[in-house]
Amino acid sequence: WIFRARHQPMPHIERHAPRHRFHLWSLISTPIILIILLLTTNLNPIYSSIIAMIIGGFAAWYCRPDLKKKMLISGFIFLGFYILYFLFIVLVFPNYVGRVWNLKALSGILIIGIPAEELLFAFSFGFLWSSIYEHFKWRKINHINH
């Protein structure tokens, strides 16, 4: 109901557009980048995850520019839900973040009581995840205009 759209198969001719040469790489880029970062850097895993999901999202965006609007909106929608969830946690358990998160291992920046890294993670997850179905299944969005 948010996007008022239906899915339709992508025509075979479109599947062979130059951008789609990177279709498989786009789909597997996030886990590959995440594994490389986890094994070769001392970054906190949440930073590695954010970097991998953003790069994977942009790889999907390059391959499937028709999903750009959906990806951005989905990133913000998931971020909104995540904020509501965290606000509830912070209101019910005021010291929860300080007790559970190792803020010294993060930036220490809290936005309305939520670690900034959590907000970046939420946006990057929604941004990437929203393109997976259409990309993996070779589906196009057919917008409904009423």
Where do the language-model regions lie?
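Aromatic-rich, lipid-facing transmembrane alpha helices and their immediate juxtamembrane interface loops
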Residues: W1-H146
